[in-house]
Amino acid sequence: MIYMKLIKYLFYIFMLLGVTGVWAQKSDIRLGKLLNNGDWFTLEEEYPMIKDSVQTPMLRLMSEALLGYYFNRPDETITCVDSLLQHYQAELGLGNIASMLLVKSIVEANRGNYAVAADILKDFTSQLREQGVAMDYTQIDEAVQFYDRFRNCPPMSIELPQKNTVIAMSNDSIRLNIKNDTVQRGTSMYVSITVNSKQYKAIFDTGASTTFMSEAFAKKTGVRLIADSLQIHGGITVYGQSGILDSMQIGDIIVRNIPITINKDTTLNKVEDIDLSLIHI
């Protein structure tokens, strides 16, 4: 179970309660539209200009929580989610509460706090089940199981050099080692990485929620398996494995204890000149 882009059932929040004034109402509607559309880059650009005229505090907190998530401001996300859950549970409704808790658990897991991430969701579903609340628990239960498997693993850490460093990147088209293949698959960013003193080429995907390897490459680099029968949710749902890579070097930066998603699909092995499919640090 991996969230490739984040949560699928997001927030339908055109609940502009208590809005006064035409311009204030326009700001709330604009904010709600950007949230519902998942237009995070536009929201990041426009939010500083309209936030003071937004009349619905819940919308402001939700915007800041999700902007913090998508633009790597984890403290901001945690603070805003906690405030939302403390003050606006009735307005949020059960679906949005679940989504906000999933966001919080993902942030904690990204920090390496796997036990905290699992327990946030486990406590939530335990309370609902005790109360006999009927809902689809599948996604949350999968997240709990996933984070539980990493519960005793050390958190990922990054060792930075004492000086500024530049990491070389290149852009190139995606090609498969298939005879007479002419399909256009777009372009990706590529970086050079070092694992176990050997250099490899990797796709650098800023939207990936995990570092992603083929089964063959995971074995080659000595990834320690944590769990089998892992559901991987992307365009389709497939089954793979999860594990930990002890270390990886990118330029002068060393990353340790990296969570890895392993795809058993041999299609990954056909990507031309690529060893590591997706990297997320």
What does each of the following model-derived ranges do?
Residues M1-L31:
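Bacterial Sec-dependent N-terminal signal peptides
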Residues Q25-I279:
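Pepsin/retropepsin-fold aspartyl endopeptidases
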